[in-house]
């Protein structure tokens, strides 16, 4: 996704 980081993080 565009924000893979967001998906990896709890928030």
From Swiss-Prot:
Q: Which residues form a coiled coil?
A: none
As its record notes, the protein acts as a catalyst of: quinoline + A + H2O = quinolin-2(1H)-one + AH2
Q: Give the EC number.
A: 1.3.99.17
Does the keyword field hold Oxidoreductase?
Answer: yes
Q: Which UniProt keywords apply?
A: Molybdenum, Oxidoreductase
The Swiss-Prot or TrEMBL record lists the needed cofactor(s) as:
Mo-molybdopterin cytosine dinucleotide
Question: According to the record, how does the cofactor bind?
Answer: Binds 1 Mo-molybdopterin cytosine dinucleotide (Mo-MCD) cofactor per subunit.
Provide the GO MF annotations for this entry.
Answer: quinoline 2-oxidoreductase activity
Name its pathway. Answer: Xenobiotic degradation; quinoline degradation
Q: What class of enzyme is it?
A: oxidoreductase
Q: How does it assemble?
A: Heterohexamer of two alpha chains, two beta chains, and two gamma chains.
Query: What is the protein's known function?
Result: Converts (3-methyl-)-quinoline to (3-methyl-)2-oxo-1,2-dihydroquinoline.
> What protein name applies here?
Quinoline 2-oxidoreductase alpha chain
Q: Which organism is it from?
A: Comamonas testosteroni
